[in-house]
């Protein structure tokens, strides 16, 4: 099945080499802006602001003020806004209502290009965030993270299908492998999405055992991979510049006969 290419500013997600996203994390405004400078220096395709690390994440006004400063720092780089809940490996927790309103404030600010909404925040929250985003020309990544295990292939595929059905532009799944077979499960689901999904997809198997999944997206179909510029935001992330070199080698050689 031919999939949609998702355009964020001048970036095309779902065509060519996987795009590199560098997360920005930090507790204070100073740490976050310093992290943004490091991220920019790594020359990523897009930057993820992990707002759940921010000590004032529950204050939408302070978050929007910080987003304006981030936008000035990052220039034309696409910005993905993410509050990763503690239940999915993040640094903080918010009520569903607060989570929704924080995402809506970021969307309305005009300073972000894409938002991440967790599938298990509930259908109503996901639909509301998708509606707000799309009315403001902001793209949506619907996500699910399992830091303990790799669910069965059928379950992973069902979650991706639900994300697509709820209106996400890009479904995302990250899982923890307990064995190399778990990594194969994740890659098999990713590859099968090329035949059944209408959207690009982002998948990864975490930690050292899952590292290969962060590198082989062009072969199996994962459209974005995450690399670190300083502090990583998840197990298994490698340096963004090192990551780009590996992706380029695969890209240059994958079509050879």
Per-range role (PLM):
Residues 1-7, 63, 185-186, 207-208:
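Short amphipathic alpha-helical surface micro-motifs
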Residues 2-4, 16-135, 145-149:
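Active-site beta->alpha loop and helix N-cap motifs at the rims of alpha/beta catalytic domains
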Residues 9-15:
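Short boundary motifs at domain starts and secondary-structure transition points
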């Amino acid at each position: 099945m031919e999939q949609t290419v998702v355009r964020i500013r001048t970036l095309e997600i779902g065509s060519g080499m996987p795009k590199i996203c560098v997360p920005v994390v930090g507790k204070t405004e100073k740490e976050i802006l310093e992290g943004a400078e490091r991220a920019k220096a790594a020359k990523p395709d897009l930057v993820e602001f992990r707002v759940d690390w921010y000590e004032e994440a529950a204050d939408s006004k302070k978050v929007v003020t910080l987003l304006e400063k981030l936008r000035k720092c990052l220039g034309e780089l696409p910005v993905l806004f993410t509050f990763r809940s503690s239940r999915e490996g993040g640094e903080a927790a918010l009520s569903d209502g607060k989570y929704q309103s924080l995402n809506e404030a970021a969307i309305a600010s005009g300073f972000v290009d894409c938002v991440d909404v967790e599938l298990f925040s509930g259908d109503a929250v996901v639909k509301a965030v998708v509606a707000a985003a799309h009315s403001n020309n902001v793209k949506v990544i619907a996500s699910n993270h399992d830091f303990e295990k790799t669910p069965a292939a059928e379950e992973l595929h069902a979650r991706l299908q639900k994300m697509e059905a709820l209106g996400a532009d890009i479904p995302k799944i990250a899982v923890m492998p307990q064995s190399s077979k778990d990594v194969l499960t994740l890659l098999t689901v990713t590859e099968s999405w090329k035949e059944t999904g209408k959207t690009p997809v982002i998948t990864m198997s975490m930690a050292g055992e899952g590292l290969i999944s962060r590198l082989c997206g062009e072969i199996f179909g994962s459209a974005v991979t995450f690399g670190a510029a300083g502090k990583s935001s998840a197990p298994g992330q490698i340096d963004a510049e090192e990551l780009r070199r590996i992706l380029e080698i695969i890209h240059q050689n994958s079509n050879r006969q």
